[in-house]
Amino acid sequence: AKLGHRVTLIGNVGVDNGSDYIFKAMEQHGVNTAGVRRCAGEDTGSSFIFLAPNGESVIAILSGANASLTPDDITSNERLFDNAGYCLIQTEIPLESAKVTAITARRHHAKTIIKPSSCDYLPDSIVANADILVPNEHELAIIETEGKTMEDKAAHLLERGAGCVIVTQGEHGCYLRGQNVEC
């Protein structure tokens, strides 16, 4: 939104000071919050990122209201996918909701970017709907058990249907693997 692009968010927040701050910030930057629901009795989800000098990070995630985002929340907001160019999906929401989001985005011809974090596995139904899959090295080891090397794991994700895989590597940059590119 800060770069002048239309941004729309679908998700859940709690009814707390955190959500008040989030709504004010999104409003200031022109983010469409029509798909954001306030959930009474829930805390707003939060993440704490600890970054080491070498670029490696440790992330602690408290899902909060994000854990209650349902596939129905996505389908009831399908109109928000109209004319979307990209759809960024984080897996701090339930995997079934992430799957429905990816399928819905694809149906609307949006490129899907999936950032798998805080999940024990990533089902084929999500991988196959990812135009761009962006795990870090640790997440890659969790979501892809086939292969021993990063390169083998990324290649297997392509076989499972991902369009391309970008593995972030802290201070070492990133590794890109697509159907016709590897670097």
What are these regions, as identified by a protein language model?
Residues 1-2, 106:
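Gly/Ala-rich phosphate-binding loop of Rossmann-like dinucleotide-binding domains
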Residues 2-85:
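Conserved N-terminal subdomain of the carbohydrate kinase-like
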Residues 15-16, 92-95, 116-120:
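Short beta->alpha connector loops
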Residues 45, 71-77, 95, 119-121, ...:
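Structural motif corresponding to alpha-helix initiation and N-cap regions
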Residues 57-58, 181-183:
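Short beta-strand segments
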Residues 85-86, 132:
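Structural motif
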Residues 99-182:
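Conserved phosphate/ATP/ADP-binding segment of small-molecule kinases
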